[in-house]
Each structure stands twice: as C-alpha cells, then as structure tokens.
C-alpha cells in the first residue's frame, strides 16, 4: 500500500469516526430530552395525587430546592421542606424522577392561582389552588423542543430567558395562570400560553421559535389547576 493509499484510508476512517461521534451525541441529547419530559409528566401526576384532594398546593422553596442532594432529599425536614423532597419522602417519586437530568437540579415546584376575584387587597397567597413546575438550565433548542412536546398539555407555559441557568430558578411563587400571553420574537421570554381569555393558544413550531434565548439560562414554567 502506497503512502497516498494510506492517507486516503485514514481520511475515510476519520470521516466515519466523526460521523459516529455526531450520531452518538444526538442520541444522547434525544434520550436526555425524553427522560426530562417523562419526569415532568410523572411529577405532575404525583402533585395531583398528593395535593389535589385538598386543592391547596405548597409554596416554592427555591433555596431549599437548590440545596438538595441525593442524600438530603430523603432526610430534609421542617416547615420549609421543598415540595419535591416531600414527594420523594412520601414515595410518590424516586430521586431520579425528581431530578432535572439536564441541569442536575431537583425540580422547583410552587403554587399558583387563577385570577384575583374575591381576594383581599395585599394578600400574598391568592388561593393557591393551582401549581407549577419549573425546568431550568435549558439551552435554546432544548427550551423550544420541550415547549413543543409538552406545552399544549398544560394550562400555563412561561419562558424565563435569563436567570434560569443551572443552579438558579427564575419563577416567583403565587403565579397568576390568567396572565396575558405575549407573542414572542427574537428569543423572548414571557407567558406563551395561559388561562386568560386570549391565552389558550396552540403552541406551534413557529410560535416556539420566537421564545428562548441563545444561552443555557432558559427556564420553562409549566402550570396547571
């Protein structure tokens, strides 16, 4: 075999190897997305089973949720126990189901309300008859794809396109699921879908492409009654 033939063979091998690496990375990314979507659905069921009978959903505990580890999630206690830890300790979730495998944080859970009718002025907890899950640490493609996959199954979808990176949560507690939706554009953040009169929109690829910044600081908030 001549030197030229050796070079050609090595070039072919290198091209094949590069293709295999790309395919392997895509397969890994696809599995990570599938696992994350599955976990959000599992958590949604656990929340309804646990808090649905009373209709009163827990306050979010951002600092406590971010501080959780695989060991402490089974032992943390007290009045301010993170909702996700409470679900694990009740046997509603496994630790792997409770974790966002992309950001490596446990899912943030908090309460929400629908409108403000009949609420005393200045109240901080307005009904608490609804809830949300926040998924953080998403890049632009992950944020848009998860929104497309699950968004239309939820009453409320909101994008935080900054401050939602791994190790942080951007959503406040006591969300109003009747907040007005925005149209998006240029990687925007904001309410995509809601229970407002004009908020029950169908999330299409075109709509999703107007949200989520070109960074890994996106978080997706999914709310329901």
Task: State each model region's role.
Residues 5-14, 71-79, 222-225:
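Charged, low-complexity, helix/coiled-coil-prone segments
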Residues 1-44:
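N-terminal single-pass transmembrane signal-anchor helix
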Residues 50-90:
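Short, glycine/small-hydrophobic-rich surface segments
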Residues 41-44, 48, 144:
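Predominant activation on well-ordered alpha-helical scaffold segments within soluble catalytic domains
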Residues 30, 46, 50-53, 149-156:
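Structured segments of extracytoplasmic/periplasmic soluble domains
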Residues 91-224:
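Intrinsically disordered, low-complexity regions enriched in Pro/Ser/Thr/Gly and acidic residues
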């Amino acid at each position: 075999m001549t030197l030229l033939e050796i070079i050609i063979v090595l070039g072919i091998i290198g091209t094949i190897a590069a293709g295999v690496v790309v395919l392997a990375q895509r397969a890994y990314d696809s599995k990570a997305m599938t696992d994350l979507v599955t976990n959000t659905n599992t958590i949604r069921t656990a929340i309804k089973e646990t808090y649905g009978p009373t209709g009163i959903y827990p306050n979010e505990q951002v600092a406590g949720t971010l501080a959780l580890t695989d060991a402490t999630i089974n032992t943390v206690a007290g009045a301010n126990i993170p909702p996700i830890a409470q679900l694990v300790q009740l046997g509603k979730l496994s630790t792997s189901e409770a974790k966002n495998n992309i950001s490596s944080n446990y899912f943030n859970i908090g309460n929400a309300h629908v409108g403000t009718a009949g609420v005393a002025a200045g109240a901080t907890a307005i009904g608490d008859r609804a809830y949300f899950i926040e998924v953080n640490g998403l890049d632009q493609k992950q944020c848009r794809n998860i929104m497309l996959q699950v968004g239309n199954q939820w009453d409320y979808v909101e994008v935080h396109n900054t401050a939602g990176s791994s190790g942080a949560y951007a959503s406040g507690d006591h969300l109003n699921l009747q907040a007005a939706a925005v149209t998006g554009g240029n990687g925007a953040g904001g309410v995509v879908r809601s229970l407002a009169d004009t908020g029950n929109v169908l999330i299409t690829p075109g709509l999703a492409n107007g949200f989520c910044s070109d960074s890994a600081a996106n978080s997706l908030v999914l709310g329901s009654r």
